[in-house]
Regions:
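A late C-terminal transmembrane helix in Major Facilitator Superfamily
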Residues: 129-163
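Helix-to-loop junctions at the C-terminal end of transmembrane segments
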Residues: 62-74, 158-159
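Small-residue hotspots at the loop-to-helix junctions and early N-terminal turns
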Residues: 45-53, 133-137
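Intracellular juxtamembrane helix-capping segments at the cytosolic ends
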Residues: 114-128
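Structural signature of the two symmetry-related core transmembrane helices
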Residues: 77-92
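Short amphipathic helix-loop junctions that connect adjacent transmembrane helices
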Residues: 31-47
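Paired small-residue
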Residues: 89, 100-108
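Pair of pore-lining "gating" transmembrane helices in MFS-fold secondary transporters
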Residues: 8-25, 107-111
């Protein structure tokens, strides 16, 4: 008789939802940032790619310095600050009066988004309520669904309510990660890991 795969816990579902939102915002920046600059600010195609360049550059910088950031702020606060920063970055894009302010917003979004998904995968691997490989598989489904379907969802939504409004909704979703993060700490191992990663 085939073994029954355990159902995801509430904490795992929250981790997955966090990854979905984070990858959704990455997809929005990757596939729609240039279009946004062109439609909102009439930026030429030769310059529209700067939006994703700013996003990607700060994301890489954030990833490379992630271990230092986590060591300084602790895991819990890193996610809290990262989600807030990412949300504010995308809101900067939405309310930017000129296109180069939107570039700053995309850069802030990239920096804020850099460590959210890696930390969620790490937390899923440390929890003890489900086998590690099963927990990671559930979180991966959410994460890569956001990555694959995100750009299409943004496009579909933009046809209905407009691209700025879609970005605003995603920004609210990013900020909501600060709440969802509190719901992923049920396993005792997460609290223990927080002690080891937070400076005395």
């Amino acid at each position: 008789k085939a073994a029954h795969k355990p159902r995801p816990t509430f904490a795992i579902l929250c981790m997955g939802l966090i990854c979905f939102i984070a990858f959704l915002s990455e997809g929005a920046a990757m596939d729609w940032s240039g279009i946004y600059l062109n439609t909102q600010f009439k930026v030429q195609a030769s310059q529209a790619g700067l939006a994703y360049s700013c996003f990607a550059a700060l994301m890489v910088a954030g990833r490379l310095s992630g271990h230092l950031i986590i060591r300084f702020f602790g895991e819990k606060n890193t996610i809290l600050y990262s989600a807030t920063l990412a949300g504010l970055g995308l809101l900067t894009v939405v309310f930017a009066p000129v296109w180069y302010v939107a570039l700053i917003g995309y850069a802030i979004l990239g920096l804020g988004s850099a460590n959210i998904v890696p930390l969620m995968f790490s937390r899923a691997g440390r929890q003890t309520e489900l086998p590690k490989h099963i927990a990671l598989s559930y979180v991966s489904v959410f994460a890569y669904t956001g990555s694959l379907l995100g750009p299409a969802l943004v496009g579909f939504g933009s046809e209905i309510i407009g691209l700025s409004q879609v970005f605003f909704i995603i920004a609210v979703g990013l900020i909501s990660i600060t709440v969802l993060n509190q719901l992923t700490s049920a396993p005792a191992t997460a609290a223990e890991a927080e002690k080891t990663q937070t400076p005395a």
